[in-house]
């Protein structure tokens, strides 16, 4: 999924239509990738990983705009499942 497609999905999720926020949202996508990588997850170009980045970026946006926003359980579970599937994968070698 391209960054532009990811940005479009993020804007739809957040119900934002103005292009004025595009640079900020693009930086949130970059930050989301960095935060996910910091948790030990190696992202791929798959749609499921792209959607994980989108969910995390949406969480970052909502956390900044509202008080006391906790990480949604579905996002925490998705991160944990992705990490566990990566760590549990059998590699040749």
Regions found by a protein language model. Give the residues of each.
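Conserved short "hinge" loops at termini or chain/domain junctions
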Residues: 1-52, 62-65, 83-93
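Domain-level detector for trafficking modules
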Residues: 65, 69-78, 82-84
